[in-house]
């Protein structure tokens, strides 16, 4: 497929194109909200590839469950040339153990999967840092997590060609 020449489009045309793309992703069931599409895309990708059932938006502590009732918090982040941070979005009420595993996906700038891990709650709890001003924990999905006992590298399971 040929890429459109975005340089010739006005700012308004670019925003309209962006809106059309989001609407189509929602129509296809990839996006569930009109927020940053990386979060919805990550949830869709992980649930599809791992055979998980996505929960409704009312489940604050987890996003999906497997056939055995194991609860998964799913988070993704896109790495770019301007921002290579591996910090995932805030995790609230971490001590309450509302999920069994955090599945984190780091995407390359082109949205391909750079790496993905399934991380047990205990390891997230040990490695996350509490931030009082947001009343949440910050967790960095670093490649070095792969060496931690219990962390599963699921990159090949979720990578899209």
What role is predicted for each listed range?
Residues 1-161:
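Nucleic-acid endonuclease domains
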């Amino acid at each position: 497929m040929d890429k459109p020449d975005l340089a010739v489009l006005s700012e308004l045309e670019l925003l309209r194109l962006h809106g059309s793309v989001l609407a189509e992703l929602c129509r296809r069931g990839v996006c569930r909200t009109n927020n940053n599409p990386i979060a919805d895309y990550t949830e869709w990708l992980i649930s599809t590839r791992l055979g998980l059932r996505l929960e409704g938006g009312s489940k604050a502590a987890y996003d999906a469950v497997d056939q055995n009732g194991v609860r998964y918090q799913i988070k993704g982040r896109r790495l770019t040339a301007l921002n290579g941070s591996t910090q995932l979005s805030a995790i609230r009420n971490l001590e309450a153990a509302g999920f069994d595993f955090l599945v984190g996906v780091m995407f390359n700038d082109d949205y391909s999967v750079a790496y993905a891990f399934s991380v047990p709650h205990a390891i997230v709890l040990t490695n996350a840092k509490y931030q009082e001003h947001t009343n949440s924990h910050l967790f960095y999905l670093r490649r070095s997590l792969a060496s931690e006992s219990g962390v599963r590298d699921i990159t090949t399971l979720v990578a899209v060609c």
